From Swiss-Prot:
Protein name: Protein BIC1
Location relative to the cell: Nucleus
Function field: Regulates the blue-light dependent dimerization of CRY2 and formation of photobodies. Interacts with photoexited CRY2 to inhibit its activity. Inhibits CRY phosphorylation.
Region (Disordered): 1-71
């Protein structure tokens, strides 16, 4: 009795009456006519294609990470996007970048004057004592 085991391959496996059907890893070479042999080779090609599909899906899964998708997108889009030199709203950008009006409000003037006062006080104390040793500490 001949049976085709769909789980392993489309090739024919002999199954005896005392032998239950099972997954057989050993395959007998086909003794089929020329037409059947060509269909078997076509089936082998189909199996090879099916084996390649999981490999391709694994590559697609690897590409699905955010960083890989961004790299792929940059490669695909490079050269197709036109970036204009002038877009007509540069004045608004310059106004937004200029933060001098905020800087005066955020940095109090008293900080710089307090630092200056401390430096002057240290210089007066050093000159009053007349020691060269104290001057070296101030200049550091």
């Amino acid at each position: 009795m001949m049976n085709i085991d769909d789980t392993t391959s489309p090739m024919a496996h002999p199954i005896g009456p005392s032998q239950p059907p099972s997954d057989q890893t050993k395959q007998d070479p086909p003794s089929l006519p020329q037409e059947a042999a060509s269909s078997v080779s076509a089936d082998k090609k189909d199996l090879a294609l099916l084996e390649e599909k999981p490999k391709q899906s694994q590559e697609e899964d690897r590409v699905d990470t955010g960083r890989e998708r961004l790299k792929k997108h940059r490669r695909e889009i490079a050269g197709r996007v036109w970036i204009p030199e002038i877009w007509g709203q540069e004045e608004l950008l310059k106004d937004w970048i200029d933060c001098s009006t905020f800087d005066t409000c955020l940095v109090p003037a008293g900080i710089s004057s307090a630092r200056t006062a401390l430096v002057e006080e240290a210089r007066r104390a050093a000159s009053a004592s007349g020691g060269l040793h104290n001057r070296c500490l101030i200049l550091r």
